[in-house]
């Protein structure tokens, strides 16, 4: 297994998204990867570093940094997607319900903008 497999898998997928012209999606994946890499204190994250405990601590770190639940959920869903691609490619071991204890939902709230009056 590649020691820097998680970041490598992410970089390959981000490159593919850019080739398909999906620049906004690639940008979100890139931001999630950079944020998680900084949290881990490494330039390249290995699949071994993606653990339940680390994901919980990362989620708490993002809350403490003032990020909103939907932003945190977006980052977690991007990381989960990268992990799942690694599992499918045989680059990562499957860990049952790895992302189960972190928030990956979408918080639906009333918009703050004023309604348009016709």
Descriptions of predicted regions:
Residues 108-118:
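Short, intrinsically disordered, charge-balanced linker/junction segments flanking boundaries
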Residues 9, 28-31:
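Structured, charged N-terminal subsegments at the starts of enzyme catalytic cores
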Residues 12-24, 33-110:
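N-terminal core-binding DNA-recognition domain of tyrosine recombinases/integrases
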């Amino acid at each position: 297994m590649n020691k820097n497999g998680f970041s490598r898998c992410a970089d390959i997928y981000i490159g593919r998204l850019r080739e398909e012209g999906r620049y906004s999606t690639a940008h979100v994946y890139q931001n999630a990867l950079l944020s998680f890499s900084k949290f881990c204190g490494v330039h390249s994250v290995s699949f071994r570093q993606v653990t339940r405990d680390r994901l919980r601590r990362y989620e708490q770190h993002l809350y403490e940094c003032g990020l909103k639940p939907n932003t945190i959920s977006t980052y977690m869903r991007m990381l989960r997607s990268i992990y799942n691609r690694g599992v499918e490619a045989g680059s990562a071991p499957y860990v049952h319900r790895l992302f189960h204890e972190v928030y990956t939902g979408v918080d639906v709230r009333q918009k703050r903008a004023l309604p348009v009056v016709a």
